[in-house]
Swiss-Prot record:
Binding-site list for Na(+): G79, T82
Name this protein carries in UniProt: Fluoride-specific ion channel FluC
Regulation: Na(+) is not transported, but it plays an essential structural role and its presence is essential for fluoride channel function.
Primary location group: membrane
Catalytic activity entry: fluoride(in) = fluoride(out)
Family, similarity comment: Belongs to the fluoride channel Fluc/FEX (TC 1.A.43) family.
Transmembrane segments: 2-22, 36-56, 71-91, 100-120
Protein function: Fluoride-specific ion channel. Important for reducing fluoride concentration in the cell, thus reducing its toxicity.
Organism: Francisella tularensis subsp. tularensis (strain SCHU S4 / Schu 4)
InterPro entries: FluC
Pfam families: CRCB
GO biological process, one term: cellular detoxification of fluoride
Amino acid sequence: MGLLLLLVGIGGGFGAMARFALTQATASISKQIPLGILLCNIIGSLIIGMMAAFLIETKLFNEDVSTYVRFLLVTGFLGGFTTFSSFSLDILNLLQRGEIFIAIGYIMVSVLASLIAVILGFYIVMGVYK
């Protein structure tokens, strides 16, 4: 339990730093749309799909190393990198500014693009191992 907690903490710290860096890097691109969080959630979905396929195809899914990889990268890094709470706050901010259609579009793009990314990531890696 202690090692897994440490792995989650290390992964989460790096994931949060990566999210911060991406949101800062994209802040000047769009003042209206929270592009950084949108990209974090899409990229995170792509990576989690790739990780799922990788763990299945490399047969690491049932081995001890799989547990460590999942806790470090999936629970830790991707947990710190992606964020539903920031996504929700971004939507609230858009609604409070009266930007209802932008908020609806942001919700639709976020959910659909993230779903497409997780499917794409999964099948990209599955294709590599076939």
